[in-house]
Amino acid sequence: MSMTPREIVHELNRHIIGQDDAKRAVAIALRNRWRRMQLPAELRAEVTPKNILMIGPTGVGKTEIARRLAKLANAPFIKVEATKFTEVGYVGRDVESIIRDLADAALKMLREQEIVRVRHRAEDAAEDRILDALLPQARVSSFSEEAQQSSGDSNTRQLFRKRLREGQLDDKEIEIEVAESMGVDIAAPPGMEEMTNQLQSLFANMGKGKRKSRKLKVKEALKMVRDEEAGRLVNEEELKAKALEAVEQHGIVFIDEIDKVAKRGNVGGADVSREGVQRDLLPLIEGCTVNTKLGMVKTDHILFIASGAFHLSKPSDLVPELQGRLPIRVELKALTPEDFERILKEPHASLTEQYRELLKTEGLHIEFADEGLKRLAEIAFQVNEKTENIGARRLHTLLERLLEEVSFSAGDLASTHDETPIHIDAAYVNSHLGELAQNEDLSRYIL
C-alpha cells in the first residue's frame, strides 16, 4: 500500500461525500502500515497500530468508508457486527472467530492473486488436456507411432487448438478424467464453525488424488480442467505462510455496531452479549495469539476500526479498558440538505446514475434536473428530521418511491417517448413526493 494519505482521501472522495475527519484518520492509519514496514525489524516490532473509534449517526458513511478502504488496502480485511458475538462459554460465536475469518479472507485473497499469476500456464495445460481427449477421434490409422507421438506439433493439433480458442468446439462432448470432489456440506450449529471447517477439510483430504471419468461439453470441461491445473500450480504451503504474514502485518478488522454492546446505565441481568463481549475483545485488540487453519496468528499489529451510532449509549459506556485501546476518536457529522444533493450528483456510480443506466436497458431515457435533485434532497432532510434519521439511506426509499411508476411501465413508456427523455424536475418531485413528505403520519410509514 504505497498511496499517500492525500491520495487515499482523494480516492474516498470519489465515493463518499463529506466526513473529512474520518477519511483523514483512516488514511493516516493505512499509511502508517506502510511506514512501519520500512522500519528496521527490531523497531518495527515495537510500533503498534493506533486503533480508531468512529462515532456518528446511522447512514452518514461509516460502513461505506470501511467498504471502500477494503478495496484500496489490498490487505486482508474483514467487517463484522459486534452484535453477532457472545461471551465465551455461551451459545454463539466467540470473538476469536473474527481472526479465523480474517485468516480465511487472507488465504482466499492471496489464492485468487496467485491463480491470476499462473492463469496463462494453467490455460495452456488445460488446452493440452482437452486436445488429448479430442484428438484420438481426429487421428487416422495410417499415422505411424512416431507421428502420433509428435502430434503436439502437428498441423491437426494446431488446427484443433485454433478452433478450441475460437469457441467452435464448445458444444462438442468429450470424456475426460477430472479430480473427484469430496466436498461435504455440513450445517453448523452456532459457535461450532471451526469444528465444521475441520470436518470439511478432513473429507476433502480423504478424496484427494481420486479421479473419475466424466462426459462433459468442451466449454465446461475446459473451465473445470483450467481450475484444476491452476490449483496444481499453486504452492499451498507457501501460500499459507504468505497469508499468515499478511494477516499479522497488514490485517484490518472493522467492527460495526460497537455501541450495541455498550452497557446502558445500571441495567441488571446476565448481560451475555454486552460487557462480556467487550471484555473478550480486549485481549484481541491489545494483542494475543489465536489458533487458525494457517497456524498461530498474533494480533499485535492488526488494525481495529470500531464504529457505532451511539444513539442510546455513549462512548463512555464502553468498559474503560476498551476505550483505552481505541485511542483515536472520530466524529462523523449528520448530513445536511447540501450533502444530500451532493450525494445524488457527485459520487462515482451515484444513485441517480444507477437508475438512469438501469432504465436505459429498457430503452427509456430519464434526466434529473438540478432543481429536481435539490428538492429531493430537501425532502430527504425533512423526513429524516420529522421521523427517524436514517441518513443517506433515506434517498434509496425516496428515489424508489419517486420512480416507482416509471420503473413499472418502463417498456411502455420507452415506446411512447421514443428517444425523448423524461425530465425529473422540482414539479415532478413535488407531485410524487410532496404530499407524502408534508403528512407526518404517511411519511412515517411510507417514506
UniProtKB/Swiss-Prot annotation:
Cellular compartments annotated: Cytoplasm
Cellular component terms (Gene Ontology): HslUV protease complex
InterPro entries: AAA+_ATPase, ATP-dep_Clp_protease_ClpX, ATPase_AAA_core, Clp_ATPase_C, HslU, P-loop_NTPase
Main location as per UniProt: cytoplasm
One biological process term in Gene Ontology: protein unfolding
A matching Pfam family: AAA_2
Keyword Cytoplasm included in the entry's annotation: yes
Origin: domain of life: Bacteria
Keyword Chaperone: yes
Keywords assigned by UniProt, alphabetized: ATP-binding, Chaperone, Cytoplasm, Nucleotide-binding
Molecular function (Gene Ontology), one example: proteasome-activating activity
Binding residues for ATP: I17, G59, V60, G61, K62, T63, E64, D256, E321, R393
SUPFAM superfamilies xrefs: P-loop containing nucleoside triphosphate hydrolases
Quaternary data: A double ring-shaped homohexamer of HslV is capped on each side by a ring-shaped HslU homohexamer. The assembly of the HslU/HslV complex is dependent on binding of ATP.
Similarity comment text for this entry: Belongs to the ClpX chaperone family. HslU subfamily.
Annotated PANTHER family: ATP-DEPENDENT CLP PROTEASE ATP-BINDING SUBUNIT CLPX-LIKE, MITOCHONDRIAL-RELATED, ATP-DEPENDENT PROTEASE ATPASE SUBUNIT HSLU
Record's function text: ATPase subunit of a proteasome-like degradation complex; this subunit has chaperone activity. The binding of ATP and its subsequent hydrolysis by HslU are essential for unfolding of protein substrates subsequently hydrolyzed by HslV. HslU recognizes the N-terminal part of its protein substrates and unfolds these before they are guided to HslV for hydrolysis.
Protein's name in the database: ATP-dependent protease ATPase subunit HslU
Organism expressing this protein natively: Pseudomonas entomophila (strain L48)
Organism phylogeny: Bacteria, Pseudomonadati, Pseudomonadota, Gammaproteobacteria, Pseudomonadales
Gene: hslU
